[in-house]
Amino acid sequence: MVDAFCATWKLTDSQNFDEYMKALGVGFATRQVGNVTKPTVIISQEGGKVVIRTQCTFKNTEINFQLGEEFEETSIDDRNCKSVVRLDGDKLIHVQKWDGKETNCTREIKDGKMVVTLTFGDIVAVRCYEKA
């Protein structure tokens, strides 16, 4: 089912992302850049692993992992996390844990778009991507 996510995606809409970044402790200047940047996300499968590349003018990141297996990740805002990504039905759920905290990133395909819901505590941000 990961195949449905394998594509190049361009951000088209973002809601409440500044509040989400603020809750994570991201500084003002970085949040300003994050709010205007429209990243491209490339999801693929390579050698039995899922690869998610995020490209933007601010910073490029890449994670590769096997579904359901914990891996070390440095987030785009430089948090050192222990992460797990799993497939739950038609949703790709990415959980990051660091310093006793946890955030969830749920990716799902709706009407040909990738909808990404970011949750940290009671703060929810939604970012929508279309195929590039």
From Swiss-Prot:
One of its GO terms (cellular component) is neuronal cell body. It comes from Mus musculus. Belongs to the calycin superfamily. Fatty-acid binding protein (FABP) family. It comes from the Eukaryota. Forms a beta-barrel structure that accommodates hydrophobic ligands in its interior. GO terms for molecular function: fatty acid binding. PROSITE patterns: FABP. It is found in: Cytoplasm. This is Fatty acid-binding protein, brain. InterPro entries: Calycin, Fatty_acid-bd, ILBP, Lipocln_cytosolic_FA-bd_dom. The modification N-acetylvaline is found at V2. The keyword Transport applies. B-FABP could be involved in the transport of a so far unknown hydrophobic ligand with potential morphogenic activity during CNS development. It is required for the establishment of the radial glial fiber system in developing brain, a system that is necessary for the migration of immature neurons to establish cortical layers. Expressed in brain and other neural tissues. Keywords: Acetylation, Cytoplasm, Lipid-binding, Transport. Pfam families: Lipocalin (PF00061).
